[in-house]
């Protein structure tokens, strides 16, 4: 490629999980420090970072679609500088560089702290790829947090050692690593100083976090949550995503004892059938999962539950799928996420026999989503008449309207004289399938 001008504006487009949202925010902070400004809404950017997800095949296809859209009908001098980051970059970096000559750089999720130097190389006319996995070095090199939304993400752990047979995460994010306790306390403090009232702890397997406090005492995630909750200016703590194998007694107790830990738990089960769970290498049964949920509900009776499901895993029969519907009927999730199985190259499940036909997966997904939507609507309807604290996150669709989140992660719309970042008391007066309408009562904290 030829040398080009230094970009003056940027846009980061993140796909997929909350971890990618966090990574996208950190990349934006690095670009800010480099003197590159966010492109105004509706205007083309000089630099576009596609922060990609590799969980599903459609997400990979979308990357190439976006590259084509960004370059269509444009000469090299008019087209933006393109960086592909994230898990697709990690898994398919060489193919991207070969297939998409318009891409200037490919950077994996554990190497994006080197993005500023790669931009300099692109300006000099050099394409580059960096998919190393030094996650600890990445966090040490990132800039300090200087701005925050009322609800902020904090990555405490990366990677996964579970090796579910359908999942690419161990190959794209690497082995489990935990960030040091002191670094997390410092970053959380910076987020709160920058305006965060709520922090969501993130990890591919967040409850696997381990560390030592300032006195050298061993801690799990429950201990970290208890320490974070001591900050009087931090009002709420959440975490996602967990594996049932790493939910210990202390974490269960923390849900009942730490008021700032919100009454919401996202705990994927994936299937309600034990044979399928074993083929997935999930290391739990449907029964052990249900008993675990019972313990969480005993500790925090108002707990809202969320989960993940995969339909059409190789070999799944109709009877096995119906076991998934049974577990949905028993748990009654407040919200959940469901997907058709998507074979990912390099995973054991991709080469398993008895791949389920697409039309069967489509029909099963439709039935599962109908059950999950029914339960979410019922949970929201059951909230009507309740008074709760809502964190104001953004303006609504008309003047004076606001959107915030309840403790149970429900979207709540209401009118009133408030500001983004306020904690307010709201009476929930009307339920929709995906949100609730509320009546403002009072402001708790500004």
UniProtKB/Swiss-Prot annotation:
UniProt GO MF annotations: 4 iron, 4 sulfur cluster binding; metal ion binding; N6-isopentenyladenosine methylthiotransferase activity
Positions contributing to [4Fe-4S] cluster 1 binding: 17, 53, 87
Entry's EC annotation: 2.8.4.3
Any Pfam family: TRAM
Top EC class, one word: transferase
CDD domains: Radical_SAM
Catalytic reaction annotation: N(6)-dimethylallyladenosine(37) in tRNA + (sulfur carrier)-SH + AH2 + 2 S-adenosyl-L-methionine = 2-methylsulfanyl-N(6)-dimethylallyladenosine(37) in tRNA + (sulfur carrier)-H + 5'-deoxyadenosine + L-methionine + A + S-adenosyl-L-homocysteine + 2 H(+)
Highest taxon of source: Bacteria
Sequence similarity: Belongs to the methylthiotransferase family. MiaB subfamily.
Protein task: Catalyzes the methylthiolation of N6-(dimethylallyl)adenosine (i(6)A), leading to the formation of 2-methylthio-N6-(dimethylallyl)adenosine (ms(2)i(6)A) at position 37 in tRNAs that read codons beginning with uridine.
NCBIfam families reported for this sequence: miaB-methiolase, MiaB/RimO family radical SAM methylthiotransferase
Record's protein name: tRNA-2-methylthio-N(6)-dimethylallyladenosine synthase
Native organism: Erythrobacter litoralis (strain HTCC2594)
